Amino acid sequence: MSLKVDCPTCGTPVEWSPLSQFRPFCSDRCRLIDLGEWFSEERSIAGEEHTPSSDTARPQLSAEDLALLEQD
């Protein structure tokens, strides 16, 4: 007996085997629809939204590092 999963896009049962070229999707079309949803941010992984603050956007340089940069 082979394992069957539902296509995440359309719900069609898909056999989970090396012969199923697009698993877990039933077709290349469903795979591309899913990829497009991730790309357009219609799908996302739940979690806190991260916005870099000005403190983390630039690395803090020591006085010694700044002096070395000024020498060049």
Swiss-Prot record:
InterPro entries per UniProt: DNA_gyrase_inhibitor_YacG, Znf_NHR/GATA
Zinc in keyword set: yes
Cofactor note: Binds 1 zinc ion.
Gene3D superfamilies given in the database record: Erythroid Transcription Factor GATA-1, subunit A (3.30.50.10)
Gene Ontology terms describing biological process: regulation of DNA-templated transcription
Cofactor: Zn(2+)
One Gene Ontology MF term: zinc ion binding
Record's keyword terms, sorted: Metal-binding, Zinc
Keyword Magnesium applies: no
Domain of life according to the entry: Bacteria
Start and end residues of each stretch annotated as Disordered: 44-72
Record: residues binding Zn(2+): 7, 10, 26, 30
Described purpose of this protein according to its UniProt entry: Inhibits all the catalytic activities of DNA gyrase by preventing its interaction with DNA. Acts by binding directly to the C-terminal domain of GyrB, which probably disrupts DNA binding by the gyrase.
NCBIfam families, per the entry: PRK00418.1 (NF001638)
Subunit record text: Interacts with GyrB.
Homology family: Belongs to the DNA gyrase inhibitor YacG family.
Identification of the protein by name: DNA gyrase inhibitor YacG
Organism the protein comes from: Tolumonas auensis (strain DSM 9187 / NBRC 110442 / TA 4)
Gene: yacG
